[in-house]
Amino acid sequence: MATITKRGDAFRIKVSLGYDENKKQIVKSTTFVPSKGTTPKKAQKLAEEYAFEFERHCKGYTQLNENMRFSELADWYFENYAPVELKEGTVYNYKSAYNNHIKPVLGNVRVKDINTPRLTQFVQSLKLQPETVRKIYVVLQSIFHRGVEQGFIRDTPCRNVILPKNRSKKKKPVLDEEQTSRFMKLIEEKKCDPDIKRIIKVLLYTGMRCGECLALSWNDINFEEMTISIEHNLADVGGKHWLTTPKTESSIRTIGMSQALADIFREQKKYQEQLIEAIGDDFSHPEMVFTSANGNYRDRSSLGTSLKRFLRGTEFDFLTLHSLRHCNATLLLNSGVDLKVVSDHLGHCDIGVTANIYADVLKSTKAKVADLVSLKLA
């Protein structure tokens, strides 16, 4: 949208038209001067109207198209915007939310007839968990926002929509040091595919997201420097697998590798070489650290099922693949590792994310520090 800056009695209007081939922002600007005697409030409104028309002129729009049905706007969004700007997995999830929940109710409605109260009524009619409703609303929000950007509609009706409140989630327990020791003993003693055991250990030792772990290639493992480079994520949608970028830019990181981890990777390499020798050229991805038995990308869902089966009937049956990441972070924080270091280690975009997720752990750690100081001063 155009930006408006007041300078004396005039208004400076700028419109961004994206970036050129050298990644330099393309900006068009103009100045609007209201006639003398115009009240400040009226001048601001006139400037906004002028900016709207100027932006439409810059982007080549000739007329609004608010008579279009919402399904037409959504079709444009999924054909032109989503494939270029969103990750393939996100596009899949957005399309699923649209086709299953939004299109049956709003698809045939003209865009000009969709207002804030109507959207509030729509989201409140969804008999789903609040977090699911919010995900559906995000799709609506994105479609309308792009519609405004492209000049199809004047404004988005998504402002001030009343959303259901998220229910407080029951926090899943994580392992303390004593439980971790018992868990590691269970891994060693209970019968299970050794390949799966190695993945579980890597997740627990590194705190990686499961998709990051399954996206590791042998080029990412540096035995000389004892480091692991995390540069990809294994996306998994509808049975299709592909490598993509990690969750955020800060998720691209390099972490240290302990000797225990190095030994696990060497075991995995030896195991994989045996598979390749048996299968030969039919082994699809010899460059990957963790694969299926025939060398295909490892399926996260089946891995989660294997973990669930492995832990069934034990004291650890509450653990999931992702909770191993939380266990890693909790162990680090309880060991006194600096919050910023833990945040970087986990690949969080912001230290505040780490502080928010592990607020209870940090509270406990602060209490331990206070007790330690008291003991020293006693």
Task: Give the positions of each predicted feature.
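N-terminal DNA-binding module of tyrosine recombinases/phage integrases
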Residues: R7-A10, L17-K112, P117, Q268-H285, ...
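Basic, Lys/Arg- and aromatic-enriched nucleic-acid-binding interface segment
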Residues: P130, R134-I136, E149, I153-L216, ...
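Short, basic (Lys/Arg/His-rich) helix/loop patches that form interaction surfaces
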Residues: P130, K185-I196, T206, I255, ...
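A short, basic/aromatic helix-end/turn motif that makes direct DNA contacts
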Residues: A215-I221, S343-C349, A359
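Catalytic-site neighborhood detector that most strongly recognizes the C-terminal catalytic loop/helix
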Residues: V174, L234, L346-D371
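C-terminal catalytic core of Y-nucleophile DNA break-rejoin enzymes
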Residues: K28-T39, K169, E225-S229, T245-E267, ...
